[in-house]
Amino acid sequence: MYHPRELYPSLGAGYRLGPAQPGADSSFPPALAEGYRYPELDTPKLDCFLSGMEAAPRTLAAHPPLPLLPPAMGTEPAPSAPEALHSLPGVSLSLENRELWKEFSSVGTEMIITKAGRRMFPACRVSVTGLDPEARYLFLLDVIPVDGARYRWQGRCWEPSGKAEPRLPDRVYIHPDSPATGAHWMRQPVSFHRVKLTNSTLDPHGHLILHSMHKYQPRIHLVRAAQLCSQHWGGMASFRFPETTFISVTAYQNPRITQLKIAANPFAKGFRENGRNCKRERDARVKRKLRGPEPAATEACGSGDTPGGPCDSTLGGDIRESDPEQAPAPGEATAAPAPLCGGPSAEAYLLHPAAFHGAPSHLPTRSPSFPEAPDSGRSAPYSAAFLELPHGSGGSGYPAAPPAVPFAPHFLQGGPFPLPYTAPGGYLDVGSKPMY
């Protein structure tokens, strides 16, 4: 075991262990109690560490003035004026949307806080004057508690309901234009509309963390500094506006505040009368969801007086009923009645899109009467719908090219619907997997 004198020779020979104090802890044996005493750290023992520094003379005069540092962000200093603490002479800040804030303050402003973060409305929008046009400044904003009480909505007003929750971590919002010259800040109003409030203590995005049902007030800081992380502050000023006091909530408690937010917030126009998010539209959407999906309406297009429309056949193809006994000979063409609904069907196209682009020329030849397939030696597949293609040039039973105008049959899964083209032709299995 090393003696402290061996571990710290720089402390000098005067370093010694303190004597045992009366009434010491009896948990250590008397032989070891002396070895666990803290050394007496008087002034001579620290001279070896402070040899390069001279002791400042003690005088009764006041210390010379030092440059003021900004107060800790998130803490509320004791301002000398009701609204601002100045170390930037001649600088003034005014609230641009003061009338809007006053309208909300007369009712009792509430700000929604969420886990993901919610923007403030109204937002702090200020104008600054009196800055040095060439100097660079930072604009900061934090939110401080107004008092040490927790509030509760009593139906008509807010009333204190107990002691406030412990203080949350202090955070500061830095305006994205910082640092910028005084001319930049004075050119137009400065808006803090991107500030977000959250109630998540583990928020990783830097949003301002607040307690629900507590009263807060935004505070704006103007700091003269050349860099964002500069330690050389040239002065700062803090501004507060009594109209901006609000109570943080997770849901609006005062119905009048809800109406004001909808009427004044341009992003809440959907909640206004006849908007997409008004109560009437929300109730209608809920009813539609409870009813379930509505079945697709299919119109009966068999009436002859129906002029044209979704079921109007404009492709020139005819559809006839499939009757194996009355099937025509391969060289015989029989006129079929006009189709009841010969227009293209979106459902048929989704099931069998290949039928709308002509059959491929490599498909085997089948006759409409479901005989044994001579080319494959196996029986015809279940529920086949035959696609008969016109004869091509050169005497072949297959067309030389796909038809110029594709047909548009209505395929229904599980049933054959042959086409009135001359046989033989290709086929498609309607009951099989769609050919994409």
UniProtKB/Swiss-Prot annotation:
The keyword Transcription regulation applies. GO terms for molecular function: DNA-binding transcription factor activity, RNA polymerase II-specific; RNA polymerase II cis-regulatory region sequence-specific DNA binding. Residues 325-339 have a biased composition (Low complexity). PROSITE patterns: TBOX_1 (PS01283), TBOX_2 (PS01264), TBOX_3 (PS50252). Residues 274-284 have a biased composition (Basic and acidic residues). It is found in: Nucleus. Residues 274-339, 360-379 are annotated as: Disordered. The keyword Nucleus applies. Residues 100-273 bind DNA. Keywords: Developmental protein, DNA-binding, Nucleus, Transcription, Transcription regulation. Its main location: nucleus. GO terms for cellular component: chromatin; nucleus. CDD domains: T-box_TBX6_VegT-like. Gene3D superfamilies: Transcription factor, T-box. InterPro entries: p53-like_TF_DNA-bd_sf (IPR008967), T-box_DNA-bd (IPR046360), T-box_sf (IPR036960), TF_T-box (IPR001699), TF_T-box_CS (IPR018186). One of its GO terms (biological process) is positive regulation of DNA-templated transcription. Pfam families: T-box. Forms a dimeric complex with DNA (in vitro). T-box transcription factor that plays an essential role in the determination of the fate of axial stem cells: neural vs mesodermal. Acts in part by down-regulating, a specific enhancer (N1) of SOX2, to inhibit neural development. Seems to play also an essential role in left/right axis determination and acts through effects on Notch signaling around the node as well as through an effect on the morphology and motility of the nodal cilia. This is T-box transcription factor TBX6.
